[in-house]
Amino acid sequence: MTSSGVLCLLGALSLQVLLLQPPGAQGAPNPDNSHSSSPAPPQTAQHLSQKSLKRETLKPAAHLVGDPSVQDSIHWRANTDHAFLRHGFSLSNNSLLVPTSGLYFVYSQVVFSGASCSEITPTLLYLSHEVLLFSSKYQVHVPLLSAQKSVCSGTQGPWMRSVYQGAVFLLTQGDRLSTYTDGVSHLLQSPSSVFFGAFAL
């Protein structure tokens, strides 16, 4: 073979080797990566938690319990015995102040108890518990939830009656929620028996 033939053979082999190499190795840009950016840094648990917190809407909520040291009325309190005020709710003059307008589930429970009923004069004992709304729309206390119980009609010995109420209401910012109870002297004052609250839906 002549020297010119050897040179032609070497050139053909070199071209074949170049064609077999990936585009990046040939000095040409890779069409698949020409517009790709550098890989994003790994996200830490803290970053993910912050993003989740931003996405989550923090809704107002409140849960109050009765003060067992007050016997002649229900004195609501927060920040004790699993009671709390969150995300705008406040407690003023024994009333819950609604922070924002919207739908709320309002609830309350009381438990009445007594040692016995009089055998001589077994008159009925009426018990009631209400959740009241005071709003700029009405300027009076309007009952939202109301329930009544009666005892001692032929009943002897210790007795107990529980009242739980709850429903959804459309409330306005600035509305005040309070309670009224008839038969306070018979209340079983404990955090798990006497409570009052609301939370936004």
UniProtKB/Swiss-Prot annotation:
Pfam family, one: TNF
Domain of life, per lineage: Eukaryota
Biased composition (Polar residues): 31-51
Gene Ontology cellular-component annotations: extracellular space; membrane
Residues bearing glycans: N93
Ranges where the record places region Disordered: 23-52
UniProt subcellular location: Secreted; Membrane
Signal peptide as annotated in the record: 1-27
Disulfide pairings: C117-C152
Classification via CDD domains: TNF
Purpose: Cytokine that in its homotrimeric form binds to TNFRSF1A/TNFR1, TNFRSF1B/TNFBR and TNFRSF14/HVEM. In its heterotrimeric form with LTB binds to TNFRSF3/LTBR. Lymphotoxin is produced by lymphocytes and is cytotoxic for a wide range of tumor cells in vitro and in vivo.
Quaternary organization: Homotrimer, and heterotrimer of either two LTB and one LTA subunits or (less prevalent) two LTA and one LTB subunits. Interacts with TNFRSF14.
Protein name, entry field: Lymphotoxin-alpha
